[in-house]
Amino acid sequence: MSRIEAVFFDCDGTLVDSEVICSRAYVTMFQEFGITLDPEEVFKRFKGVKLYEIIDIVSLEHGVTLAKTEAEHVYRAEVARLFDSELEAIEGAGALLSAITAPMCVVSNGPNNKMQHSMGKLNMLHYFPDKLFSGYDIQRWKPDPALMFHAAKAMNVNVENCILVDDSVAGAQSGIDAGMEVFYFCADPHNKPIVHPKVTTFTHLSQLPELWKARGWDITA
């Protein structure tokens, strides 16, 4: 690929340090329904997995049927509370975003209002004017590549000429299946390794400009 048309970012765990917060909110949600889970185990198992799928898995394992909309309300309220009090940016996110000269967007399995909340709190929204794309917009979520195609169409770019930066296996798979160059963020030692010709693994956002330059992509100032 000689020219990069756009850079796609995941949100949670890639730009905003929210994965542990979200795991704690899952634990709180299930506690409301009498199910006790270990926060670290939740973090390891469900990174990048959409909410209703997590509810289905845990419900099946515990032999219960949960009202998903009621459970979601508990979860969203707890996430909002924790975001307001504890949320921080991933180290290096601000510097990277300010250096990128190519068009950018965010592609997340989370709802748009969650992205608005987290990225607004961390002063990142101005990097992505009207460029927040959620699986909820099209009712299809990573690892399905549909979200990548949806975002590329809205951005008026060729998806195969775009980069995806994501910290989850599900996200990386969506990028692979869309034909993108995937930069797999593995700062978390719990991340499963991915070996694929379309995937480059890295451990800190500050590494990306040099990795891109090494590929001949001049997309940072």
Swiss-Prot record:
pH dependence: Optimum pH is between 6 and 7.5.
Record's keyword annotation contains Hydrolase: yes
One Pfam family, short name: Hydrolase
Molecular functions (GO terms): magnesium ion binding; manganese ion binding; phosphatase activity
CDD domains per the UniProt record, alphabetical: HAD_BPGM_like
EC number: 3.1.3.-
NCBIfam families on file: HAD-SF-IA-v3, PRK10563.1
Protein name: 6-phosphogluconate phosphatase
